[in-house]
């Protein structure tokens, strides 16, 4: 679907009567602007730009072939006399290559310039290497080896074959040889050679005796490989397509003129039918472009010379361009540029010395969805919005009188620019396919009739833009058309205004909504200029817009969506063929083969992928694979369709999800839910998007949603597809901006299904008759099968058959057995029967069961049903309603299913029975060792004895006594029995209370107090009773004081020991510098390391450690910890263990404050005991020392690095990891976090002033 | 001359409703295009096909007994036939023409006025209703099912009424109930009667393939068996007008009133003042596959039994418990084997026996043990091939007959000798169950044979020990020296390994202990052969898996499918030919059975050799061919190699079309050839004459039957009793007829002519007289039949 678009045509001046053109290939990136022309036995060097400076570098008569040898940087010239010399292009120095004494007819170098082929005057084919050593020589008319000649494989005789339109009599015709008999001497005797692109084969065309013009195929070894099939009337040009599949030779038939295409083996393969007669317009030159895309045919008729450019697609030859030249200044030669990147550049040299350089580019001419293809005199138009017509067919064909060179389609107008420089204007093509009115023909005015216009572009309704280049500058032309004043009815077009730009303009882009601005780009420096149209219709170059590194081949101005109204912003998309794609100079992609803008997206293709870029933020939103080599033809936004053309020419239309979502989104915005759902279904879009697209809007317009959807089945689909997931953030995130998505306040994504179903259900419930099916679906989605059944059941009363249908629908969604259970759960036998009859259940089984149930009283029936359905709580409530006769069963049921609390609630009215439940509950509680609760329950259940026992077990002595009282048991005795256990539990005070209350033995009272070290209390009691304190209390107290003192001393010692040891270890580690490494060496033998804690050093990898113990069980783990925290000297983790021990110790010490204070106070109270005061003072002193020692040492022990603060973390994870610190950190990680900080000592005022 | 049929063997067609057990105790079933009538209680404990009824021209799809002497059948030839039978066969038949496509199911019922109401359903999506009275039949209604099919239909007289109820199942998964119009307009005029649809029974979730009615007290019970694996029982109970009016059950009030919960009833008005309530009685689930046939039986004390046959290879008899729940009482079926399942099943008239026919056409019969009613034992039955039978061969002394068929099996038929009774013939073994259609067969010795299928190799087999034991026992063989020799060395049996293609010998049989240990490997054992000591001819499931013969050798040599085989009388040579279109492939290969080497290739023919025959003394080998020629090869003295000595050519061959068959006279003096142009020629060596290609063999007698193609010919094994020059020949034709001729010195005389019911109804493929003293002839044909005749000369 591509056309050749003329980028520029520049005119240069060269040498008159040129014979050959030599272009220097690119050297070091830059192309030399010097080229060589052979004319009049001389070789001229021509400077392309600047002043035309001709330099003769060699002079040789009768030049038959020249070649620029790239490696040698020399020009190889062959003369008819047989001389082959090498000429240095700079100095003009010559050196002899070789000599052929019989003279040379033709010379051709292979494309890789390794081999050269000559045909001598004696029709010998000579093949030489680049150093002119002969590889092979043989006469042209040598016969093929017999084993290489054609073999008839026998597809039957000619008589039996099908002859198509020639009919059956064709079978009987003898092949006439008359055409061959013609005197071959009359033919052009030229010999021409053409190499295949890879240099493996070449073809020599010559006139053979008897046969006339024919050709032979030789390989690069000089061996004759094939001869041509017998064909009459071949002409003298021959050219091998560089990709190698065809040899093109003009051939004349009685009824048609063709370019015959032969295969390598010399067999005719197919042909290209020419639109003219070879007799009248003989072909002078055939040239394939270097990339094989374009075939240029130069013809010479009597009155004018023409150049035809053909391309092939889908095996159809399209005539894309026709250039017409007057005979007054005839053409001398055609030459396709061989340089990289300039494959579509054609050099045309005229006899007068004029040098025209045409630069074409392939482009798709699209007008929204309409794409046109030029094919000679026909314009093939297809509207891809309506149909995908595969080329070479098309929706409509417009025929013109002359060949079309370009056309512009914009909006409803169509401008066709033909080879004779007329413009045909048709202004109403929006009715494509219907009869088009006859176009207006615009004649060029005098100025324009001589200009070859390039870059024809539509600008505004009555203006066109075009460029015309000459030498180094370009004129931008604004063309308008008007009525011819002299001849009414005749129209002509003319230059309205123009502006000259320095440099060659190769692309023009017009801003579609601007009307007065456009952009042009020049080849020379890659500059893009903004040009504006002034009010007086003159053009002005405003500013340089974007500077690219390399000039682009294609530029396009696009509007960025949403900006049209507020001053609009646009962007310039530029693409260099097969290269880089830019938006306003910002690089989007590499190796881009084609692009197209559709709505808000820029779509571009790479070799086998298609990408979508959002225009506003230039974010690539989606990609997909496409068939290899496909290029975009056009995109139809309205159908979300992208049409691709594959290399062979066939079309493929795809609906990319991004575009479809855009359409669906648009429909949703406009509230066209039905259409949106239809489109989603058609394009396999998940229906969740209907809701997720805009949650708030959906919620607010849910009524409209329901109204719009006329088919309830669609709603069912929608509901059943719902998922607890926001698709705009997941599957379809390409089209949505997650940050812009807002939700109603009460909505959460993980409850989406429920939310939507509730929402719709509320609405649908108002019009149940319309939304029966979706309502049922919604209930199923919500898990309310019962509600769904009720909807059907209600319907059943009015319309049984409809209810059957609804049930059928429900059965699609739910298993019939589940439904049966749900129906049973309604206790409505009618409903049960209704459902059961639709299932494969045997009536003989379910009927007796239902009848059994029905025979029961209602409540008990419900109980049985609930029990059957395992709804135990509900079952129990119904059983409770059954009353007395089921007490036993209820109790059993409660026990069985553990429904004690429920049972108590349900049986609130049944006070007597409740007691049974309490007892059962208590039994249960006792069984699970909740004795205190059990006691309470027993009490409520009236089982006081049991309550007492349970309370006793928990040593709840108040309750025990109260219960004992209730049971009128001897209180004292009960109380006494409790004292011992209380003491064992360390609850001395309570024990004392009991003893005091219930035992009159004062001694025993004191014993209890003293045993609990409750000296203050003892002193108080003694004081009250005037007992002798010293006698009873003092000895015990003093003994205790001494014991406490020694214990404090021991604590201090222990603390100091630990601390010292810790400091020693640390010092050792610090001293040895690499102390950790020393210890680490031992690690190998130590199996204390936990597998779960990480202690990997840079020296040790975890895998080298021995396997075996995993310390997985908790018992093992504790044992392991104990081992790890062993205080045994030499343990590699001793410091850790010490810290742990110290932490515990310090905490314990801090807790001593109250006991010490109390003890001291008690000692002080013993005023009469001589050694009490010193003891108290000593105690206080000892403790103080202890506390001070602790306090002083805290910071020494808990160093900052132990804490592992945030600072530490930095260099542990940063780029420069401090492995030492990392090791330490890992060691400290063995400690529980709490113990990595120094213990907070909560100090109270524990000292007695008097003891200081 | 009297010809009596000794044995007929044929399988039931692969259709549902294709077999029925009549009130007279006979089982009628569709066998190819014929209906076979079998007496399953022949001589008390045996079974025999009594006769065949031939009138259909295409496959018989369904048969149904209407009465003791009336049988209704339907076939693919779009006709239904009402047969009237007596002890010896058919007396009358009436062809019901009208359908345009195959008739699939039929039923008929006798009405109070003595006339018959017949219903037929066909693939042309119509059901036709006929009345039949006084040998006249009229089709009075055609029910069009638009584009659906009827799978099964039943007619039933309504209780307490003269109304007929028609139930049929269609491909819409429902059962339709139709009855006559209530309007009295056309009463008395049979043509005015019209059936109308009254109700559709829905509930099945797949096609309903079996229906049956039974009268239960005042009610009717309809059983429907479906491909959804369920059987549903529907109750059709008469209702009075009052009941009808009260009947309305309000589902919505069900929980609140005191009525018993019942299944919803549908009230139909089927007569002027007759209302019936239709309700679902029960749903039976027990089969794991499609259910094809259901059949009711009512015991003398009015208890109901329901039989259901399923594709899951089981047949279940259902009985109601006291609570009315239907439970399976007996489940019988096939165990193992490469079969699919049952296509139908029936109770016998007394309900003490049940019959089922399977996918491969085999019959099973189980009888209730009179002493232990829970015990159902399998009984003796006659089966047969379910594809065209292409070759047969008698054992050299006539002890058994072996047949090869396109159903990919070879079967061995032998007489069951019982004291005090005539022997009946049964299938005793199935030596080969193959993956290709069988084509040819040659017996090398009593316990060794070669067979050719539609493949390029000839396979040879030898009987296993287990067969020899059972064969001797059942057929009463004595003095079996060959067997004695083999018994010790032979394998016990054979089986086809799970992933194999050839029968492998099984030497050692796993002891019981081992086989009980269940491991995963045992699920797919390498062999599943179980030796069985037979008292009676074996049942189908035994035949299917336990009577294989181990394969001895594969003979490779032919380039195309094997076509004919022959062996010399002493088994010392085997000759084989294959399909051929040129002389190279048409060569005959001679094999040496002692070492299985090729001895020689004999050329002579241009096209496929259709049959081969060695002369009784093995001196000559005769071959006949598609190229309308015969060739005669003679063994040179003192060598095993044969040489072409005579053949016909275009000038002297009497036959102008393909020569189908050939045979030698027992004395080696004559040989006979028969061809498609209806010519039978007896050739005799007259004098040495080297000039002609015939080399002295001359046509001694030519018999030409116009418009017949003689596809089989055979000489008997002796002269006509009392003569020394009169030969007896049997001819079989393409139309299925068998003719017996005597041949005396060039003169033919027709002795007997068997019609299609007696002989075959499609091409006779092979005829052979039984070796031995008695004159017995075996025949096989494309109609799946294998028959043995006893010929008595009068």
From Swiss-Prot, chain A:
One of its GO terms (biological process) is dosage compensation by hyperactivation of X chromosome. SUPFAM superfamilies: Tricorn protease domain 2 (SSF69322). Homodimer. Component of the elongator complex composed of Elp1, Elp2, Elp3, Elp4, Elp5 and Elp6. The elongator complex associates with and stabilizes microtubules; efficient interaction requires the full complex. It is found in: Cytoplasm; Nucleus; Cytoplasm, Cytoskeleton, Spindle. InterPro entries: A-sol_ELP1, Elp1, ELP1_b-prop_2, ELP1_N_b-prop_1, HB_ELP1, TPR_ELP1, WD40/YVTN_repeat-like_dom_sf. GO terms for cellular component: cytoplasm; cytosol; elongator holoenzyme complex; microtubule; nucleus; spindle. Belongs to the ELP1/IKA1 family. It comes from Drosophila melanogaster. This is Elongator complex protein 1. Keywords: Cytoplasm, Cytoskeleton, Microtubule, Nucleus, Phosphoprotein, tRNA processing. Pathway: tRNA modification; 5-methoxycarbonylmethyl-2-thiouridine-tRNA biosynthesis. The modification Phosphoserine is found at residue 1094. Residues 1106-1116 have a biased composition (Basic residues). Disruption phenotype: RNAi-mediated knockdown is lethal in larval third instar (L3) stage. RNAi-mediated knockdown in sensory organ precursor cells abolishes central spindle asymmetry during asymmetric cell division. RNAi-mediated knockdown in adult mushroom body neurons impairs protein synthesis-dependent long-term memory formation. Residues 814-1252 are annotated as: Mediates dimerization. Its main location: cytoplasm. Component of the elongator complex, which is required for multiple tRNA modifications, including mcm5U (5-methoxycarbonylmethyl uridine), mcm5s2U (5-methoxycarbonylmethyl-2-thiouridine), and ncm5U (5-carbamoylmethyl uridine). The elongator complex catalyzes formation of carboxymethyluridine in the wobble base at position 34 in tRNAs. ELP1 binds to tRNA, mediating interaction of the elongator complex with tRNA. Binding by the elongator complex stabilizes microtubules and promotes their growth. PANTHER family: ELONGATOR COMPLEX PROTEIN 1 (PTHR12747:SF0). GO terms for molecular function: tRNA binding.
UniProtKB/Swiss-Prot annotation, chain B:
Transmembrane segments: none annotated. SUPFAM superfamilies: WD40 repeat-like (SSF50978). WD repeats lie at residues 55-93, 98-140, 147-188, 203-244, 286-328, 337-376, 384-423, 433-472, 557-601, 604-643, 654-693, 705-751, 759-794. Pathway: tRNA modification; 5-methoxycarbonylmethyl-2-thiouridine-tRNA biosynthesis. Pfam families: WD40. Its main location: cytoplasm. GO terms for biological process: establishment of mitotic spindle asymmetry; tRNA wobble uridine modification. Disruption phenotype: RNAi-mediated knockdown is lethal in larval third instar (L3) stage. RNAi-mediated knockdown in sensory organ precursor cells abolishes central spindle asymmetry during asymmetric cell division. The keyword Ribosomal protein does not apply. It is found in: Cytoplasm; Nucleus; Cytoplasm, Cytoskeleton, Spindle. Keywords: Cytoplasm, Cytoskeleton, Microtubule, Nucleus, Repeat, tRNA processing, WD repeat. The keyword Cell membrane does not apply. One of its GO terms (cellular component) is elongator holoenzyme complex. Component of the elongator complex, which is required for multiple tRNA modifications, including mcm5U (5-methoxycarbonylmethyl uridine), mcm5s2U (5-methoxycarbonylmethyl-2-thiouridine), and ncm5U (5-carbamoylmethyl uridine). The elongator complex catalyzes the formation of carboxymethyluridine in the wobble base at position 34 in tRNAs. Binding by the elongator complex stabilizes microtubules and promotes their growth. Belongs to the WD repeat ELP2 family. Component of the elongator complex composed of Elp1, Elp2, Elp3, Elp4, Elp5 and Elp6. The elongator complex associates with and stabilizes microtubules; efficient interaction requires the full complex. Folds into a two seven-bladed beta-propeller structure which is required for elongator complex assembly. This is Elongator complex protein 2.
